[in-house]
Amino acid sequence: MFEDNNQKRPLYIPYAGPALLETPLLNKGCAFTSEERSSFNLEGLLPQNIETIEEQAERAYRQFMAFGNDLDKHIYLRNIQDTNETLFYRLLHNHLTEMLPVIYTPTVGKACEEFSNIYRRARGLFISYPDKDRIDDMLQNATKQNVKVIVVTDGERILGLGDQGIGGMGIPIGKLSLYTACGGISPAYCLPVVLDVGTNNQQLLSDPFYMGWRNPRISGEEYAEFVDAFIQAVKRRWPDILLQFEDFAQNNAMPLLNRYKNELCCFNDDIQGTAAVTLGSLIAACKASGAKLSEKRVAFLGAGSAGCGIAEQIVAQMKAEGLTDAQARGRVFMVDRFGLITDKIPNQLDFQRRLSQPVGRIADWPVGDNISLLEVMEHGRPDILIGVSGQPGLFTEEVVKTMHKHCTRPIIFPLSNPTSRVEATPADLIRWTDGQALVATGSPFAPVEYKGKRYVIAQCNNSFIFPGIGLGVIASGATRVTDAMLMSASRALAECSPLVKGAEGSLLPDLADIHQVSRYIAKMVAKTAMLQGKAVQTPDEVIDQAIEANFWRPEYRRYRRTSF
């Protein structure tokens, strides 16, 4: 729990020569000192000049800027990550706002689609169904022994791009990069995993260069048993792991979370992380206008696991503000491709049924059976509109202007990723509401100029939440991720909103402040874990010390030679 993070202490290294240069966690390149070059048999293997990490980072940045498109920049950064991780994170530290969209959304989506074509070097674990009886051995093969955070995907629902098979590995790699860059979690503790259960993407199956298991996806009992075999093996190998489920399809995401959330320390970022950052943003938006969330009405376009996860967090916050469960749910309207979800619609999933509107509550609406989003705008009169549909352009001018008729300051969050899937662009939303809409998006957008005013578009990015949650779990030794811990993360994020502190501020903090935001979220998460008995009670100052002790910095340490 209270690990020494004094990076001035030397590391004792058993590797030497080319083996040391080929170890990304330890390689310093031309920053090895003369003493280290002699001690580790590196003389003659490196150019003569000894550089600082800042000199290396400046050269790397110049090379980065020479590439003409973001996918090539992504490939370049991944190459640095696979050769010198400390330099990679120093480069991100120096240019985080610029590079975050390159290492993660939206560029990571294209990298996943092209995974087999741009593959350079293995990172993480590829666990394929044909090898299901050897999962324990595979975990022993991991190059990192003291793993504390795993991000795992099966590649079936990658962003808004669907089934990418083994190419989904780009998401765990990218997410864990953010755990380190934003939350200070050492890369030595992070392990990306893809469960290769086949793919139903015919384009991939027909591609001669596809690197995954060439088979249709397994499902049902076969799938459940395979995932369980993986989970049980992880528990044997790393009993105190924090495991994040990532980009699982709707029919698997919620069942897996419900099955394992009380068995190990785990959460689903698409459901819970997205919900937490969205709720934090909404709380901040309401505070800035002097209102409570419980006074608002909320419409969703998209009623999958992510949308319903956000809705449940909103309901929980409304109840915390004094509403009954029925009152809170009556203020939430879930719309899918068939229209508003009501309690008379058959074949609903369990998590949708809890959010369906009773037909009696909308009996006075002059509408037919399939109630459109536009009709919800007209008769439900929501103040907040959230898009998690994965379908572009569905927040039409008519829908938005209808909302604006009854809502002076509409809050509109088109959250679908990547940018090509967004429900409406910020420029359109601001224009259609004459600059009155408060907008946050799932992917990054440039500021919008409208009538002489500049509107900064907040990115409702999970990177404001999950790194802090991870840091809080590791620092406190929490054994579970609970709903209350996620709620604490949301409220902590809202407290960090510049808009709450000043009318002209941004809805979410600047990425330049992400380390302090993550530290604060980590502290609130840790305190809640302790209050719930999920971590050992310690005073505030000890929590602060634990967070700092676990906050890794991209700096080279001195090396001393030792033997195996």
Swiss-Prot record:
Catalytic machinery residues: Y104, K175
Catalytic activity: (S)-malate + NAD(+) = pyruvate + CO2 + NADH; oxaloacetate + H(+) = pyruvate + CO2
Keyword Metal-binding: yes
Pfam families: malic, Malic_M
Alphabetical GO biological process terms: malate metabolic process
Binding site for NAD(+): R157, D270, N417
EC number annotated for this UniProt entry: 1.1.1.38
Gene Ontology annotations for the cellular component aspect, listed alphabetically: cytosol
Manner of cofactor binding, per the entry note: Divalent metal cations. Prefers magnesium or manganese.
A GO molecular-function descriptor: NAD binding
Cofactor: Mg(2+); Mn(2+)
Keywords, sorted A to Z: Metal-binding, NAD, Oxidoreductase
Tagged with keyword NAD: yes
SUBUNIT field: Homotetramer.
Membership in a protein family: Belongs to the malic enzymes family.
The protein's name: NAD-dependent malic enzyme
